Amino acid sequence: MPEKLAKAIANPLFPALDNALRSGRHVSSEDLDNHALLIEFERELGMFYRRYNTELIRAPEGFFYLRPRSTSLIGRSVLSEIDMLVGKVLCFLYLSPERLAHEGIFTNQELFDELLVLADEKKLMKFVTHRASGSDLDREKLYDKVKTSLRRLRRIGMLIPIGENGKFRISESVFRFGADVRTGDDVREAQLRLIRDGEAVVHQQEPSQSSLLDGFDADDTGHHDSELTMQEGEV
C-alpha cells in the first residue's frame, strides 16, 4: 500500500468519513476537518475507491461525493422525484439575494412557500391526491412530504440544520441539482426554468432524466425513481 494512502486510512477521521461517503453524503467546505482530509489525500483516496469501481468526485464548487459505476461494489439507491424537486429549489435559494438577506438561514416553511410559488401547484398536488386541486389537508400532506425530503437531503449533506426549529443553512453541495446551468448568463433564471419546466439536470449524469413533475402516478409513497443516484443508505 502506498505510504500516503496508508497515512490517509490511518487518520482517525477516516472511518466515519468513509462510512459517510458510502452512505451517499456530500462533503463540502463547511465540514472543515473531513473536507481538509479529502483535499490533502484526494489522489490517494481516488485510487482507493477505484478498487470498488467507484469514483471520488470533486465538483467545481469544491464538494466531494462518491459516484458508483454500474459494476460498483458499493451499493446505490435513488432519490424520489419530490426529493429532486426540493433539491432544485434549495439550489435556487442558494443563488438568490434572499440568502444574503437571511444570513444564509431559511426555515422549512420558507422553503415550502417558495416551492409553491416556483412550481406548478396542480402538479405538486399529484404527489398527494388525484384531484385537480388540493384541499388544506392535501397541502398539509404535501408539507409533510417536503419535510421528509429535507431530512433526506440533510443526511446526504445538502443542508446544515440550525437548532431545533426547522431552520437550516444551504450547503454548496446543492449544486448537484443545478450543475448544468453553471455556465449560463443568468444561472438563477436558468435554475428557475428547470424547476418550472420540470427538468432534472444533474452534474455529470450520463442518462437523460425524466421530468420531475410529469409522467408519474400520484400515490402516498412519494418514492418515484429518479436517475440522480446516491450510494446505499437512508437517502
UniProtKB/Swiss-Prot annotation:
Alphabetical keyword list: Cell cycle, Cell division, Chromosome partition, Cytoplasm, DNA condensation
Q: Which domain of life is it from?
A: Bacteria
Gene Ontology biological process terms in this record: cell division; chromosome condensation; chromosome segregation; DNA replication
The segments labelled Disordered in the record are 204-235
Please give the Pfam families that the UniProt record associates with this protein: MukE
Q: What does this protein do?
A: Involved in chromosome condensation, segregation and cell cycle progression. May participate in facilitating chromosome segregation by condensation DNA from both sides of a centrally located replisome during cell division. Probably acts via its interaction with MukB and MukF.
Kindly provide the name given to this protein in its UniProt entry. Chromosome partition protein MukE
Q: Which organism is it from?
A: Photobacterium profundum (strain SS9)
Q: Which gene encodes it?
A: mukE
